[in-house]
Amino acid sequence: MRENALIQFSSGRYYQGRGVLQKIGEESALLGHKALIVVDDTVWKKTEERVREYLRSASVEFVRYAFSGGCTEKNYTEASQIGQAEGCTLVIGMGGGRAIDTAKIAADLMGVRCITVPTSLATCASTAWLSVHYREDGSMIGNYWTRYSAFCTLVDLDIAALDCPQRYTAAGILDAMSKYPEITYNLIIGGRFQKNAFSETAALVARHIFDELLEHGESCLNKLAQGLVDEE
């Protein structure tokens, strides 16, 4: 029994593969006619031309919030104010966890949905319901639970795998593997998770990911070093 509590697993829509950034136009159009894009200068230089083309083809306008720093009240408040003033009907967060978390909170403050585009395979923020926000001095405030998880997540492997330092992918592999002992500990010993179908499913998925990455993680890194992306 969940005592009428809301159950939410992850993004409502998830795409992964080479070239899936082209989906950004049609997915944005499902949410309206104008997007607020939260993205830093480095990522924008790599993606601007394609994003402009894909949004234009779907008749979606956009305004950009030039992100820098961390997921702070200043950043997500400024972003949301710009989005509201410009009449934006959705938010797109592009980059790493800090930019994406900022976009998710800005969307929550605006009362609209968010599309996430991670540029690293070490970015779990793109599908997580919560955001982690910080003070200006870098100290953590805590978790910010938005009303909705991401509407859609686009993991373009041409960007997140092939155009990203390999150390980030290695970090992502280890982070994903750590979920199995973390979830198992909290189910059996820690007492943080209630035992039910949802937590047990999470443990099974985490175990499967752990086993797959233990077996194939090293070979995947070797292939990426050669510029190869395949079913493995």
Q: Which residues does each predicted region cover?
A:
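Alpha-helical scaffold segments in soluble metabolic enzymes
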Residues: 23-27, 50, 78, 82, ...
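A short, small-residue-rich loop immediately preceding and capping a beta-strand
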Residues: 83-121
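ATP/NTP phosphate-donor binding region
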Residues: 1-90
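Short, conserved catalytic/metal-binding motifs centered on acidic residues
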Residues: 17, 97, 177
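Short glycine/serine/threonine-rich phosphate/pyrophosphate-binding segments
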Residues: 21, 44-48, 73, 98-105, ...
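Active-site segments that bind and position negatively charged phosphate/pyrophosphate groups
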Residues: 195-232
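A glycine/threonine-rich phosphate-anchoring loop and its flanking beta-alpha core
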Residues: 12, 110-205
